[in-house]
Amino acid sequence: LLTSRGLGDVYKRQVLGHENETLTEKIDFKNSTILINESWEEGIISSIRTGLFYLSSDKNIDGVLIFMGDQPAINSEVIEKLLLTKHDDDEVVVPQYRYETGYPILIPRYFWNKLELITQDDIDGDDSVFKNFDLIDFFESSESKMKILNFNFLKPTDFDKQSDF
C-alpha cells in the first residue's frame, strides 16, 4: 500500500497474511510498516480491510495505492502517473495495459468504508464469495466512477503459480 496524494509524502505499508513470518525473515521491506492480516483465510479482501483499518485514523491520507504482492515489476511510470493524475474524490484510478486493466489501483478515502464492510459471509467453512475477490471487478460491477490511465505496454507478470518462475 502506498498512501497519500502526490509524490510528496508517500508512506509504504505492507500487509502480510499466510506465511508472514517466513516473508519477514527472507525479505527486506526497507522503510515499510508491516501489518499482519490474521484473517488471511478470507482472501484478499481481508488484507485490504486490514490496511484500510490501520490507515483510517490518519485524516491526512486521502487515498491508497493498492499493489498485488505477486507483481513486483510495476513500472515506475505507472506509479507516478497514478499518483499525479487529477481525479474526483469519488473516482478510482486504474491503469490499463494495452487492453487489460490491472494493478496497482488508486482508491480514494471515499470508498474505504464500503470496502471495510465486506466480510467473509459463510461461517460453515465453505469458501466465501469474496475468497477470490477482485478489486477492479468490484468497482466495475458496482458502477463506481473510474478513471482509466492507458499505458502502451503489457500488464506486469503475475508470479502466482510455480510455472511463472
Language-model-derived ranges and their functions:
Residues N31-E42:
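Conserved donor nucleotide-binding strand/loop of the catalytic core
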Residues L1-Y11:
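Single conserved hydrophobic/aromatic residue that forms the stacking wall/gate
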Residues K12-T33:
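Acidic donor-binding segment of Leloir-type glycosyltransferases
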Residues T119-F165:
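Conserved alpha/beta core of the MobA/IspD/sugar-nucleotide pyrophosphorylase nucleotidyltransferase superfamily
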Residues E41-L115:
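Conserved beta-loop-beta/alpha segment of the NTase-like Rossmann-fold superfamily
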Residues G6-G8, D28-N31, F111, S142:
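Short, structured coil segments at secondary-structure junctions
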Residues R5, N37, V92-V93, K161:
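Structured catalytic cores of enzymes that bind and process phosphorylated ligands/cofactors
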Residues T22-L23, K114, D158:
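Phosphate- and divalent-cation-binding pockets in alpha/beta enzyme and binding domains
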